């Protein structure tokens, strides 16, 4: 009798353990406070893509294998569809940008470029709040600087890369180590010189989405006509500052891109911290849903705090990005969805290629059983991929669609991407 009792207890323990694994950490279940309603016909912004920066001069170039990991969209690949590169002030260094850019283009990604400094002969120092070594573009060199940017566009084209866009200046309002621009100086360049650039023009790339830099462009018809993409960074920007009513009012026909960030920190070897890495997917969610951004671009692609670690493997932060980048492809459109159906649950939805893609983040310590309802649309089947403390983009079982809705379990401290085939 004793061995049989032990065997029964062991079987029960195994069953309980398996149930705990399926339900996630803590194995506590809650029913979501409300359904997630996905309105397939309520279209928001067109998505250009997700990606990151390659900066050979500062961080070394990506290797051939790392380029595949970054821009390929197979297993153990990030599926990035945007590459940002550096416009070196010295044209003798431009060749360093070519190989990774060509690889990105080969995979269907778009490439854009940002300058930190004009050529040294175009720059002068000035007294900025007591800093006599501050740099700015000489006022009589604006046309020459526009030609410098054009020369980079031409160089890349001659080397097999048609730049999608080029920026006027990286972080002109945080330029302690590069070139400062005042709002008035950027406005002048956008009005008088940006129209001569032979690529889409990005401006003003504020470090913190400070609107005093971009408001003058939006309020000036000529400057606005010469701007194709309003680009910004989100360092320290509160979510309450993500919406931009003036852009909504004046920016018809213009794109809105988030062109650089790392989040939530740049601590050494922080890329695999869990559940901290979930902050990345939540930040992307907020950029898409609260900010209506069309692109989300990380800082260095390969870094100890980035989407790819120095050994070339994808980090937990990278897998959080991949929940968007691998599935929400260029040209997809964000659609309306219940963004916060339960405490610490965040949902966004997109459509394209006859699919609906839903990204659901559960930052709580309990699993959530969530009902998803498709409005103005139907579904034939639902696939899903899950990243948690113990899994990385792990495929889950396909889900049953009943009418126009399906139930799904969102494990504690996890992110799940659902692909709904229509």
Swiss-Prot record:
The active site is at residues 171, 260. It is an enzyme of class 3 (hydrolase). The keyword Ligase does not apply. Its EC number is 3.2.1.136. Transmembrane segments: none annotated. InterPro entries: Glyco_hydro_30, Glyco_hydro_b, Glycoside_hydrolase_SF. One of its GO terms (molecular function) is glucuronoarabinoxylan endo-1,4-beta-xylanase activity. It comes from the Bacteria. Optimum temperature is 65 degrees Celsius. Half the activity is retained for 25 hours at 40 degrees Celsius and for 5 hours at 50 degrees Celsius. SUPFAM superfamilies: (Trans)glycosidases, Glycosyl hydrolase domain. GO terms for cellular component: extracellular region; membrane. It catalyses: Endohydrolysis of (1->4)-beta-D-xylosyl links in some glucuronoarabinoxylans. One of its GO terms (biological process) is xylan catabolic process. Pathway: Glycan degradation; xylan degradation. Induction: Constitutively expressed. It is found in: Secreted. Keywords: Carbohydrate metabolism, Glycosidase, Hydrolase, Polysaccharide degradation, Secreted, Signal, Xylan degradation. Optimum pH is 6. Residues 1-32 form the signal peptide. Belongs to the glycosyl hydrolase 30 family. Catalyzes the depolymerization of methylglucuronoxylan (MeGAXn) from different sources. It cleaves the beta-1,4-xylosidic bond penultimate to that linking carbon one of the xylose residue substituted with alpha-1,2-linked 4-O-methyl-D-glucuronate (MeGA). This is Glucuronoxylanase XynC. It comes from Bacillus subtilis (strain 168). The lineage of its organism: Bacteria, Bacillati, Bacillota, Bacilli, Bacillales. The gene is xynC.
């Amino acid at each position: 009798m004793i061995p049989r009792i032990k065997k029964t207890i062991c079987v029960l323990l195994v069953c309980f353990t398996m149930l705990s694994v399926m339900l996630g950490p803590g194995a506590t279940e809650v029913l979501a406070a409300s359904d997630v309603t996905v309105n397939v016909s309520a279209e928001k912004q067109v998505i250009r893509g997700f990606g990151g920066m390659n900066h050979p001069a500062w961080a070394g170039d990506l290797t051939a294998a790392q380029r595949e990991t970054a821009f390929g969209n197979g297993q153990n690949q990030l599926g990035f569809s945007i590459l940002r590169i550096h416009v070196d002030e010295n044209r003798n260094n431009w060749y360093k940008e070519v190989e990774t850019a060509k690889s990105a283009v080969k995979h269907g990604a778009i490439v854009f470029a940002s300058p930190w400094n004009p050529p040294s002969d175009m720059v002068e120092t000035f007294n900025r709040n007591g800093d006599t070594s501050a740099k700015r573009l000489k006022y009589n060199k604006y046309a020459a600087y526009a030609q410098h940017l054009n020369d980079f566009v031409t160089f890349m084209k001659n080397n097999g890369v048609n730049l999608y866009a080029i920026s006027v200046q990286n972080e002109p309002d945080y330029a302690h180590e590069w070139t400062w621009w005042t709002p008035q100086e950027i406005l002048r360049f956008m009005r008088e010189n940006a129209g001569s650039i032979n690529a889409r023009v990005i401006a003003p790339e504020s470090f913190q989405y400070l609107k005093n830099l971009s408001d003058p462009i939006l309020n000036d018809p000529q400057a606005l006509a010469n701007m194709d993409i309003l680009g910004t960074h989100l360092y320290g920007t509160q979510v309450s500052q993500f919406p931009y009513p003036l852009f909504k009012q004046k920016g018809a026909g213009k794109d809105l891109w988030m062109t650089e960030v790392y989040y939530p920190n740049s601590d050494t070897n922080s890329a695999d911290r869990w559940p901290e890495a979930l902050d990345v997917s939540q930040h992307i969610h907020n950029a898409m849903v609260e900010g209506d951004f069309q692109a989300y671009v990380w800082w260095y692609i390969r870094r100890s705090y980035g989407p790819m670690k120095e050994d070339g493997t994808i980090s937990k932060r990278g897998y959080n990005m991949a929940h968007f980048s691998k599935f929400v492809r260029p040209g997809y459109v964000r659609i309306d969805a219940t963004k916060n159906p339960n405490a610490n649950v965040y949902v966004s939805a997109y459509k394209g290629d006859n699919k609906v893609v839903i990204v659901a983040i559960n930052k709580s310590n309990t699993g959530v059983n969530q009902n998803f309802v498709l409005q103005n649309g139907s579904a034939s089947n639902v696939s899903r991929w899950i990243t948690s403390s113990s899994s990385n983009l792990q495929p889950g079982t396909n889900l049953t669609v009943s009418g126009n809705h399906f139930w799904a379990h969102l494990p504690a401290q996890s992110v799940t991407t659902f692909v709904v085939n229509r």
